Amino acid sequence: MRSKEKNMDLTSTENEAAKKAKKADKWADKPAMEVRDLHFSYGKNKVLKGVSLKIEEGKITTIMGANGCGKSTLFSLMTKNLYPGKGNIFLKGKNIQNLNLKEFARKVAIVQQYNSASDDITVENLVAFGRTPHKKMMQGDSAEDERMIEWALEVTNLMEYRDREVSRLSGGQRQRVWIAMALCQGTKTLILDEPTTYLDIRYQIEILQLVKKLNQEFGITIIMVLHDINQAITYSDNIIGMKDGVVLVEGDPEEVITEESIRELYGIELGVTRVDGRKFVLAV
């Protein structure tokens, strides 16, 4: 009798596993994120005018364009900080408006352009806040929480600073802490708003190389907003160029970044050349 019950339990477990696998397969071919006919206005000022785009899973996609093009508003909508007037945003086929903030934070991590923390908080304690979406109120750290904290500190090269106050770090180091906190969420998608702002060139490159590492070694889908065209070309698999609330160009940097597209996006004349096989944009 026990053997029969055991077999029934096994069959039930196998059926449940099969259902979960089938459900996962349903979304397997969906883009990491998709925007469909997105509109948004501030009062009578139309900022986004029917934006549609797809974010390829496992790639680095950069959104760029001149000030006022709508990229910051698009970022806010993609991170659930604003709600669209019309249109939808899908995360692996699921409308993000149907996800509460905690559910969304288990799937998407965000690094804002401006961040602040109390002066006395340590690196490790700030990074640990990334586990909040996975916890109940007043719940202590689980073994998985501790593992993720250690991993996030390790991958961002912050182990030696773990007990130091964040306020005592350089700008580049602080940015790594915020990225580590986002990584601690354990998501497959990371969205960054101008992650190199206010950093000198050394730390800009350091942060972008870290972003590239996260993508190449851990398969994290990266979506970021950048101003520097050459950095976007160097570190992106895909570029989305916006102007006046619409997408003008979308695709491989090698194909979409041209003198003509730069003129359309920014209203300036820049030359496009190659050095050692790599494309660069130069003033003319």
Task: Name every feature range the model reports, one short phrase each.
Residues 190-194:
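Catalytic Walker B motif of ABC-type/P-loop ATPase nucleotide-binding domains
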Residues 128, 143-161, 186:
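Conserved ABC ATPase "signature" region
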Residues 165-169, 173:
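Conserved ABC ATPase signature
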Residues 64-66:
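The feature captures the beta-strand-to-loop junction immediately N-terminal to the Walker
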Residues 79:
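Helix-to-loop junction immediately C-terminal to a conserved catalytic motif
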Residues 33-35, 48:
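Conserved structural motif at the start of ABC-family nucleotide-binding domains
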Residues 87-95, 104:
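Conserved ABC transporter NBD signature motif
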